[in-house]
Amino acid sequence: MKTLLLTGGSSGIGLTTVQLFAQKGWRVFELSRSGKTTAAITHIDCDVTDDTSMKHAVDQVMHLTDHLDVVISNAGFGISGPIEFTSVEEAKKQFDVNFFGAFRLAQSVLPIMRQQGYGRIIFTSSVAADLSIPYQSFYSASKSAINALALALANEVRSFGIRVSVLMPGDVATGFTDAREKNIEGANIYKGLHSAVETMEKDERSGMTTAFIARTFYRIATAKYPKPIYVGGMIYKVFCLLNRLLPKRLVNWIVG
């Protein structure tokens, strides 16, 4: 039986993804702070911002299985607000969950995959990694850092039979929107702050379904020759293509 380990599977994209893999007959391990064990999914408590918690969670998984086929780093959240009024602590928290959480997971599972001689690691990134969104700068930066990490890692571990990919979804309708930590300090100076965040949240609430993204994860997990980067959603593939073809000055003006 193939195995999946996924972080951040208690809700949203992660929950739909572990449910899909379980339906496909995989043994599924879901790591988060608030998930629940079901007949098909084994939940293990894990805080991706804590080294000890991550190592202990992966150790628990390996007490229950002798191999890992696919690992998906999906835990994440978002903050919004002007760069000028974002504290270093807020920025560090964003990176600690989104980037360093992914890094901790990769470090924890790589020795296992290296020893078994195969495995696949998939990182959840975002179209925001390619298109830096105003008032969502640190979220964009954390996802861009994940892309850079994944591309480098793919070359480092290819000889061990390990494949690494990134999935960059566009807007997806989940509880992620309501969970965003919004900093409205400076709204009297940055007049476009409220309207920019409102537009962003409206787009997210009317975005793609979690089922679509879960199916994309499954396609990446089972692909014979997985690509390094996938973009979720046709319109977002067009956006990312135009970002590469058009002058950066024009793209940045359009995004802004």
Short names for language-model regions:
Residues P82-I83, E90-K92:
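Substrate-binding pocket helix/loop in short-chain dehydrogenase/reductase
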